[in-house]
């Protein structure tokens, strides 16, 4: 039987104006933005709607605003009659959005966790990240291991397995630069990313430990539907298992390819990306062309998605 998954974006999907159309056209979206502003003690909605872009790009602002825009979009999707997902998943930050829509976290707790996560990631030790195209994951992993072995004080790892040939490495500035040079020597493309931290790498270990302490005091509930998590690309519904895996996420790779492959293996043939941008549906298309994909980021895309989903289920 065909199944549906809802996917939630992470950092990099933000844009000035995100969520504004839904806020203006769906009272549930407006109420969600208001609740998030109250929980944050600041106007995240104004940052979403008006920017400025330079402020929106700061990790401390990017992460909570993407959470806000995504949760508001899901509220509108629910109100408009969007079908209940069989699975949910989120890319990095998006996993916290997924946990919230699955009723694992309250909006208040989700906002507090994301604000803490963003602050820790923005203040983490200086590092670098580089996108790598045209190289098999196992080849890149071996290359990173070789670079790291050359200097025990430097490390570089594969941080994002976005598709089979779209990867991201993360680590010490020098080690990432060396890995990028070797990628080019071997015929691949290496594109430095405009970030100042080594996200999803061992350099995040101290931040991850502090985040785990915050998580320990945060109440989790069992999920209403399975959440396929980043660290192992497997589903969880038990509260403590969800919390344990989330605590490891900040210093572990995002296994997005494996998540999509798992969903397909479980019979998921349709995904809806809910929140700003179309990054995740673009990745899904490259991983499995048999999966139908839709987006919800404004009222027009919501109506088009629901019309298409209703046509599929009739």
Predicted regions and their residues:
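FabD-like malonyl-/acyl-CoA
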Residues: 2-145, 270-304
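Non-catalytic peripheral regions of patatin-like phospholipases
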Residues: 70, 212-218, 237-254, 271, ...
């Amino acid at each position: 039987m065909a199944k549906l998954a809802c996917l939630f974006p992470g950092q990099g999907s933000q844009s000035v104006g995100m969520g504004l159309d839904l806020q203006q056209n769906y009272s549930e979206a407006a109420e969600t933005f208001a609740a998030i502003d109250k929980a944050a003690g600041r106007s995240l909605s104004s940052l979403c709607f008006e920017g400025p872009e330079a402020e929106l790009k700061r990790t401390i602002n990017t992460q909570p605003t993407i959470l806000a825009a995504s949760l508001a979009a899901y509220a509108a999707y629910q109100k408009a009659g969007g079908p209940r997902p069989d699975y949910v998943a989120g890319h990095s930050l998006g996993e916290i959005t997924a946990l919230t829509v699955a009723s694992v976290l309250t909006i208040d707790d989700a906002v507090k966790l994301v604000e803490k996560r963003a602050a820790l990631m923005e203040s983490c030790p200086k590092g670098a990240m580089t996108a790598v195209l045209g190289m098999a994951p196992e080849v890149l992993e071996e290359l990173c291991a070789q670079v790291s072995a050359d200097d025990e004080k430097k490390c570089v790892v594969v941080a994002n397995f976005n598709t089979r040939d779209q990867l991201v490495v993360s680590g010490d500035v020098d080690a990432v630069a060396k890995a990028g040079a070797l990628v080019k020597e071997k015929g691949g493309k290496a594109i430095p990313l405009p970030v100042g931290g080594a996200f999803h790498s061992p350099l995040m270990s101290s931040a991850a430990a502090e985040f785990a302490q915050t998580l320990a005091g945060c109440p989790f509930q069992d999920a209403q539907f399975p959440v396929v998590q980043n660290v192992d690309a497997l589903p969880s519904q038990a509260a403590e298992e969800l919390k344990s895996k989330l605590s490891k996420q900040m210093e572990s790779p995002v296994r997005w390819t494996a998540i999509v492959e798992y969903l397909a293996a479980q019979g998921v043939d349709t995904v809806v990306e809910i929140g700003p941008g179309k990054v995740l549906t673009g990745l899904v298309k490259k991983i499995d062309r048999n999966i139908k994909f839709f987006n919800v980021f404004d009222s027009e895309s919501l109506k088009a998605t629901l019309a298409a989903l209703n046509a599929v289920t009739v």
